[in-house]
């Protein structure tokens, strides 16, 4: 985080200030799929229920991932809803789509940022300059549509889409399709 502060202080000291340019760290969030949380893959797949699920049971590690990521895709829809969302306070509910405060999340376009940042606010469209981000996501343009309680200043949490988890433990917070953790990038606000 020291590098982020240093690089952004340099930008702020320019005669024009930040002028819509920031130095950010890009991280990843995704929608985990219940189908990937099996005992055979090393997960705690013990069926459990939580408040808001009306007695329906899901693998324990799947619900842990939903709590962290915000949403999860379920195998069997409930009243036409294919997702579980975490409502906070230990409560869950069913949803039609993964969404943030700015609407339905779009794979490899939606992003989340910490509330209260002047330029990196909900609704901002940004372009990142990072070959790593471009390679992993196939995109360098993002719209901030979401927030996250654990996000830090100058962090852009890029939405990957749906996937089974990479593996149990610390790897359940990553999609199976990539081992990406983070990348630094210059970001420019386009709107």
What are the residue ranges of the model-derived segments?
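Solvent-exposed, well-ordered loop and adjacent helix/strand elements within mature globular domains
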Residues: 6-191
């Amino acid at each position: 985080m020291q590098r982020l502060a240093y690089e952004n202080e340099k930008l702020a000291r320019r005669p024009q200030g930040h002028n819509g340019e920031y130095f950010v760290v890009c991280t990843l969030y995704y929608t985990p799929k219940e189908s990937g949380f099996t005992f055979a893959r090393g997960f705690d797949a013990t069926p459990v229920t939580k408040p808001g699920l009306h007695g329906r049971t899901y693998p324990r590690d799947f619900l842990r991932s939903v709590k962290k990521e915000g949403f999860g895709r379920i195998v069997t829809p409930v009243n036409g809803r294919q997702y579980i969302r975490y409502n906070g306070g230990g409560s869950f509910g069913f949803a039609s789509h993964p969404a943030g405060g700015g609407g339905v999340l779009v794979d490899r376009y939606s992003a989340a940022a910490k509330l209260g940042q002047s330029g990196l606010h909900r609704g901002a469209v940004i372009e990142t300059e990072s070959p790593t981000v471009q390679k992993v996501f196939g995109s360098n343009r993002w719209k901030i549509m979401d927030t996250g309680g654990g996000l830090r200043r100058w962090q852009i949490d890029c939405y990957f889409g749906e996937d089974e988890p990479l593996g149990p433990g610390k790897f359940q917070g990553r999609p199976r399709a990539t081992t990406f953790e983070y990348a630094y990038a210059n970001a420019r606000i386009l709107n």
